[in-house]
Swiss-Prot record:
The gene is ybeA. HAMAP family: UPF0297. Signal peptide: none annotated. NCBIfam families: PRK05473.1 (NF003997). Belongs to the UPF0297 family. It comes from Lactococcus lactis subsp. lactis (strain IL1403). This is UPF0297 protein YbeA.
Length: 88
């Protein structure tokens, strides 16, 4: 695999953004209901890609796996920046 020094533009649609947010809320609620620390589990999944961090309960694992982890990270960063006064 070769890499380039050129900056690559990465974009995805608005409907995906809403679905990612809704999915994260659903997964958070499932993790909390099962007695896990939701933040730690979601971070573990996003960093490693290992779906074992997310339970199968209420289809949470399949829901979160529909999205690329890069897209999840992008949505999390955008929301954090918006919540902290950055005009995107």
């Amino acid at each position: 695999m070769s890499f380039t020094d050129e900056t690559v533009r990465f974009e995805f649609g608005d409907s995906d953004k809403k679905e990612i947010g809704e999915t994260l809320v659903d997964v958070y609620n499932v993790l909390e209901a099962k007695g896990y620390n939701p933040i730690n589990q979601i971070v573990g999944y996003v960093l490693s890609g290992d779906p074992a961090y997310i339970p199968r309960h209420d289809d949470a694992r399949n829901k979160i796996r529909r999205f690329d982890r890069d897209d999840i990270v992008e949505e999390l960063i955008k929301n954090y920046l918006k919540d902290n006064g950055v005009n995107l």
